[in-house]
Amino acid sequence: MAQMYFYYSAMNAGKSTTLLQSAFNYQERGMNPLIFTAAIDDRFGVGKVSSRIGLEAEAHLFHADTDLLHVIATLHEAEPRHCILMDECQFLSKEQVYQLTEVVDKLDIPVLCYGLRTDFLGELFEGSKYLLSWADKLIELKTICHCGRKANMVIRTDEHGNAISEGDQVAIGGNDKYVSVCRQHYKEALGR
């Protein structure tokens, strides 16, 4: 029986690398994975999942209004799929997370979701909130703070490297804008 998995972490913990390894494992066994990523995240090019260590794969895009159940069912009917791999899942809507539960429950296809748990203010993203609520399995991927402790928070920085404590929830960026830190250093950076 298929299940939905949510692999979550702060930035730079290897979520995309883990997704790409999963895709390779399925392909190595002659199976056909289907990869999606958020259209909003074009840091490494449109329609690609890329990792910091240089791995990449082509991916279908999801937008805020994409009906994932319909798209996946249509692609699965044309060519059977053995798993769905979703990158940047923090950008999913509540409805899209529900659609992914339908892929698992009605199409019996495993769905592996990868994304950030919280934003730079320590607040849950909508997609992450519902994945934490509805996924069958939750797997935390770990990275480390500069002090050596587990990093579970993300700081957004300005062009001078100073921590920012206000702004839009979504601002696409990588190491140029975000730093993963432990809770203690998060609070210190924001003066809390």
From Swiss-Prot:
Coiled coil: none annotated. Signal peptide: none annotated. GO terms for cellular component: cytosol. Its main location: cytoplasm. GO terms for molecular function: ATP binding; thymidine kinase activity; zinc ion binding. It holds the Pfam family TK. ATP binds at residues 9-16, 87-90. Its EC number is 2.7.1.21. The keyword ATP-binding applies. Keywords: ATP-binding, Cytoplasm, DNA synthesis, Kinase, Metal-binding, Nucleotide-binding, Transferase, Zinc. GO terms for biological process: DNA biosynthetic process; thymidine metabolic process. SUPFAM superfamilies: Glucocorticoid receptor-like (DNA-binding domain), P-loop containing nucleoside triphosphate hydrolases. The active site is at residue 88. It is found in: Cytoplasm. It catalyses: thymidine + ATP = dTMP + ADP + H(+). The keyword Nucleotide-binding applies. Gene3D superfamilies: 3.30.60.20, P-loop containing nucleotide triphosphate hydrolases (3.40.50.300). NCBIfam families: PRK04296.1-5 (NF003300). Belongs to the thymidine kinase family. Homotetramer. HAMAP family: Thymidine_kinase. This is Thymidine kinase. The gene is tdk.
